[in-house]
């Protein structure tokens, strides 16, 4: 099995494992805990616990489905950037080579580039890759503002479903914490009930023990993913960008300065390129309507905005200052 086929298989296996564990957890919580509390012990709270559990679990499935159905998005309709002005070439007749040409002044003021200062190019999709775009072999196309591939969900997380993914992880964490806390609170009462009925010990049912272990470990993992994702929203930093910074990946930026195009590597001490402050970062992901913040609807920019990712003001002030300090080079017009 090649790597691509293996990854496609994981897209099915991991969600299948999740569904299996959720099914077992539902049996342990709803029947072993809630039903016994209500039917055998006379606790009306058992019925209330069951209703809240079912509501939370239904919401988890709705938002999970929305993440997969909406998908990460696809880069389409990106017009090729005209790097140089047509007809501006100066040709060396002897060498039969272009010695200079005029750079198009209509290029975006700032963009992530390759070593030549050109916008990133995807050989698979045969298109320019706007800032924050990555090609995903899993979905077979370029994904705008790609965050990561979540095998537990079964799809890639990108610009279109990123907000819904955050809502999903929040709901899933809430569901798991609710299950863990209520199980821990009512399990001793079941033990007391056993003792009152003459049982030699108050050891809880094995399914309850398994439920506590599974929900505890799972809640810790899911909550950490949720908090990390929201921290990324606050800083306008995707998971892939954060990983690249930790690994020291070379990232080049091309920007306009006094009529020149400057190529400069990003430095670890630089401000985050897309960080515009908490309020703007939040609205970029969740939108401006507070009602939409809680509903599973994507916030999608227009296609023509692919090359208009707003850079943070601190970053835009820092890169020309570094150029004046001698860091960077001018883009060659050949």
UniProtKB/Swiss-Prot annotation:
Catalytic activity, as annotated: L-cysteinyl-[protein] + hexadecanoyl-CoA = S-hexadecanoyl-L-cysteinyl-[protein] + CoA
Membrane-spanning parts: 12-32, 50-70, 164-184, 207-227
Subcellular location: Membrane
Enzyme class: transferase
Position of the signal peptide: none
Membrane topology term: Multi-pass membrane protein
Post-translational note: Autopalmitoylated.
Segments forming domain DHHC: 120-170
GO biological process terms on file: protein targeting to membrane
Alphabetized InterPro entries for the sequence: Palmitoyltrfase_DHHC, PFA4/ZDH16/20/ERF2-like
Enzyme Commission designation: 2.3.1.225
GO cellular component entries: endoplasmic reticulum; Golgi apparatus; membrane
Keyword Lipid biosynthesis recorded: no
Keywords in alphabetical order: Acyltransferase, Lipoprotein, Membrane, Palmitate, Transferase, Transmembrane, Transmembrane helix
Family: Belongs to the DHHC palmitoyltransferase family. PFA5 subfamily.
Domain notes from UniProt: The DHHC domain is required for palmitoyltransferase activity.
Record protein name field: Palmitoyltransferase PFA5
Name of encoding gene: PFA5
């Amino acid at each position: 099995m090649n790597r691509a086929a293996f990854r496609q298989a994981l897209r099915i296996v991991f969600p299948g494992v999740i569904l299996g564990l959720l099914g077992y957890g539902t049996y342990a919580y709803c029947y072993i805990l809630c039903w016994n509390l209500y039917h055998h012990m006379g606790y009306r709270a058992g019925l209330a616990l069951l209703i809240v559990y079912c509501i939370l679990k239904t919401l988890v499935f709705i938002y999970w489905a929305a993440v997969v159905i909406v998908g990460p998005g696809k880069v389409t309709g990106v017009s090729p950037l005209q790097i140089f002005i047509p007809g501006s070439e100066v040709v060396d007749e002897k060498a039969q080579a272009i010695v200079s040409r005029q750079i198009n002044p209509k290029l975006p003021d700032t963009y992530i580039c390759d070593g030549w200062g050109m916008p990133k190019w995807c050989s698979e999709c045969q298109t320019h890759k706007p800032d924050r775009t990555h090609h995903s072999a899993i979905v077979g196309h370029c994904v705008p503002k790609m965050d990561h591939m979540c095998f537990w969900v079964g799809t890639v997380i990108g610009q279109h479903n990123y907000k819904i993914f955050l809502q999903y992880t929040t709901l899933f964490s809430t569901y798991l914490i609710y299950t863990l806390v209520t199980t821990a609170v009512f399990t001793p009462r079941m033990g007391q009930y056993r003792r009152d009925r003459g049982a030699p010990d108050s050891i809880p049912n094995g399914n309850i023990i398994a439920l506590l272990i599974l929900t505890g470990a799972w809640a810790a993992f899911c909550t950490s993913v949720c908090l990390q994702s929201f921290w990324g929203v606050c800083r306008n930093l995707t998971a892939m960008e954060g990983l690249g910074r930790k690994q020291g990946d070379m990232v080049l930026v091309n920007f306009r300065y006094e009529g020149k195009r400057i190529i400069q590597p990003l430095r670890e001490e630089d401000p985050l390129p897309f960080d515009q402050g908490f309020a703007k970062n939040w609205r970029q992901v969740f939108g401006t309507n507070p009602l939409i913040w809680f509903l599973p609807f994507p916030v999608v920019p227009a296609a023509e905005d692919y090359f208009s990712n707003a850079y943070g003001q601190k970053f835009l002030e820092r890169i020309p200052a570094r150029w004046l300090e001698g860091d960077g080079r001018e883009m060659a017009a050949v």
